[in-house]
Design a protein with these regions (language model features):
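Gly/Pro/Ser/Thr-rich low-complexity, intrinsically disordered segments predominantly at protein N-termini
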Residues: 1-192
Length: 192
């Protein structure tokens, strides 16, 4: 096995081959449809935002829905992803390692993965019928980019500062600032 950055080179795999292979690994891997990609660690802010998100969701979700952290995989467009959090409102098999029918997925953006999260994963989430909303949370400022279904369209909106994240599919309205309480953000860039 040859590794290149965070990509394990094994040759093209099928989804079933990947799932069988990954269950035997100590580390977590995403699957891009061809090969395993090792999951990397995050910053303290990334972890704090994701933790605050899960805590905020858990106490507000409508009955029948449950939030899961980043150690549970989802299947999207023939690929395997580990979002930072995901909500399902469907019954689950507690022994499974695959979350069925995610309704809302959340990614905390990192410098090293933001382009994949914004483009590749967003397209995969849009192609997954159960996913109604993809929330991408910033790590360097209070902000989110939200894509949601509007009929046949996948429509993006940017939320900043005092905005409220409205997610009717899971019965939640969440002030964005709640996810950043106590988190030290870098100073805003100036146009000097």
């Amino acid at each position: 096995m040859i590794t290149r950055m965070n990509v394990v080179q094994r040759g093209p795999m099928t989804l079933d081959e990947f799932l069988a292979w990954e269950r035997r690994q100590e580390l977590r891997y995403e699957f891009d449809g061809f090969e395993p990609i090792a999951m990397t660690g995050g910053t303290l802010n990334h972890s704090a935002i994701a933790t605050d998100l899960v805590s905020a969701l858990r106490g507000r979700l409508r009955p029948g829905c449950r939030v899961y952290r980043s150690d549970v995989k989802i299947l999207v467009a023939g690929r395997v992803r580990y979002p930072d959090a995901a909500v399902t409102c469907s019954p689950v098999d507690g022994q499974s390692d695959i979350l069925p029918n995610p309704v809302v997925v959340f990614e905390v953006l990192s410098a090293s993965t933001a382009s994949v999260d914004r483009v590749t994963k967003n397209a995969e989430y849009a192609a997954t019928p159960s996913i109604q909303r993809n929330v991408m949370l910033e790590q360097v400022r209070i902000g989110a980019t939200v894509f949601a279904r509007d009929g046949a369209n996948w429509v993006g909106t940017v939320l900043l500062d005092d905005a409220v994240l409205v997610m009717p599919e899971i019965g939640i309205e969440l002030p964005l600032r709640d996810l950043y309480a106590g988190i030290e953000l870098p100073p805003p860039e100036t146009d000097d």
